[in-house]
Amino acid sequence: MEAAQSPCLRVSVSPRPHSPNYNSLCMSWSTVRVPASSANLGPGFDALGMALGVYLDCRFRPSRRLSIAATGRDRAAISTAADNLIWQTALSVAADVRMKLPPIDLVIDNQIPIGKGLGSSAAALTAGVVIADRLLGLGWRPPRILDEAARLEGHPDNVAACVLGSIVASAIDSGGVVRAVRLELPARFGIALVVPDFELPTVEARAVLPSCYSREDAVFNVQRAALLIAALAAGSTTAFPAALEDRFHQPYRIPLVPGLADILLLRAPGLLGCALSGAGPSILVFYESGYEAVCDLVRQIFQLHGHSAEVLLTHIAERGFEVGQVPGPPAGAAFPEGIDA
């Protein structure tokens, strides 16, 4: 879903007697790569998430002082101070398990557009949980990492895609445990993103939604969500135009995204359908062929409403987060002198 652009978590960490001996840790750089994600996919409000082949890459290692460097897309929007979301997430995990986290050197190479409905904060939260898991030696498996990331995010749809990859249907059961099922997809359609030149804060996008829905609208969305999951699993593209219809969130967000009404009604050769990505304003485009022409139509609609837009050709990321190691520091990383954490 819509990844909340909330302030970074702020916690204090009390060490416990059996924290790891960080002097014995290997000082080579560890890595974590997390995919972007698109939530909702039309009718699957707060339930469906898709991992995308656009990534947040982090390198990290224990250090004497906290140092954070940011490169890549929207780097000016990424804090390199102690309130960095990735670092604060790692601290929150450490506090939760009552262990002490060492300061780290952290290099963030981001390619995910920030504030555009593409799961940038979910990727950061997932990276923070993974970093804490590695540094503290917790040995968490993906389901535990997903539970922790969903607890911090407040909903599981984006982080489920970040952790598991592909397209994921998820829910939180009555005991607070995330239940998620990953779909294995036949590759019979393409994915592209049209990213306009403005941001849409999640809190604003959620504020326009009603507090309750009619039975008619609820049945409408349940039918479409079921149809979409079946179409995705079977590789049946003929159902896409109907399966992407929605009455839960997109109609209410039309005033916030200039051109959205026309984009959702767009029909063209090779186009399977469009959906608002998460809370928006980016548009997720499903196509069979001719993505350039299809995406150009979406871009032209934004232009008619006074906004430029960028087309990103991408794909469904089959893998969720991945971890590894590299022998030396990343080239060209410029660190501040140190941060008082």
Please place each PLM-identified region on the residue numbering.
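ATP-binding N-lobe of GHMP and related small-molecule kinases
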Residues: N23-K116, V130, R134, L138-P142, ...
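A generic local secondary-structure boundary/capping motif
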Residues: D46-G49, A150-A160, V178-E184, I229, ...
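Glycine-rich, charge-dense phosphate/pyrophosphate-binding loop(s)
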Residues: L232-A341
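Intrinsically disordered, low-complexity proline-rich regions
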Residues: P7-V11, P15-S19
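Active-site rim beta-loop-alpha module in soluble metabolic enzymes
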Residues: A192-P255
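Gly/Ser-rich oxyanion-binding loop with an adjacent helix/lid
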Residues: K100-R179
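Short beta-strand-to-loop capping motifs
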Residues: P62, I172, P196, V285-S289
